[in-house]
């Protein structure tokens, strides 16, 4: 693993360093004031500003602004990235042919460039998936409530599959819906539909929503409708994985 950094290179020195990194399969990161033009399925232009540029050996190219986790412009892998000079500026050109696309970044001032000869053969393995939550609950129903007994996993109804159909210590039916992410109002609505279906033949049926967490708005909606929430915080998601929910869901 090798890391080389050059501060404030001239356009010509930057082009030499960048193309050497591309030839040798290194990751290149650049801090620069630049403007970006995209042409392909649509077209777009991003005016002058300070940005972080990342070029990877597989042709992936990313343009990051100072805030936010998503790149403002990018090129997926499968293409090429090259450096050149044009009208006194250094230029990074990322392009691919299927579909035909190009991202041209004109660097008006390069603050720094880092070459990273990275080695990484690991594969990301996610733990705590929804399937693992189901396995855990099925093996440990007491984690939700003492005396709870699972009768059926993924029972089919006309509204869809209920995650768990159970009975509590008193023999009362319990409909359980499990979510991997923070519980939302959509999840509450789903559980309520299931419970209403069973309440047609048994007024005593209980409804239980299980998730790593829930907002006060969701727990209030559950409480106001006679439903319950159980938190399994150990299955909470971090920034590596979750499905995004709309603000109105909470």
UniProtKB/Swiss-Prot annotation:
Its EC number is 3.1.-.-. Keywords: Cytoplasm, DNA-binding, Endonuclease, Hydrolase, Nuclease. CDD domains: NucS-like (cd22341). One of its GO terms (molecular function) is single-stranded DNA endodeoxyribonuclease activity. It is found in: Cytoplasm. One of its GO terms (cellular component) is cytoplasm. Disulfide bonds: none annotated. PANTHER family: ENDONUCLEASE NUCS. NCBIfam families: PRK04247.1 (NF003270). Belongs to the NucS endonuclease family. Cleaves both 3' and 5' ssDNA extremities of branched DNA structures. This is Endonuclease NucS 2. It comes from Halobacterium salinarum (strain ATCC 700922 / JCM 11081 / NRC-1).
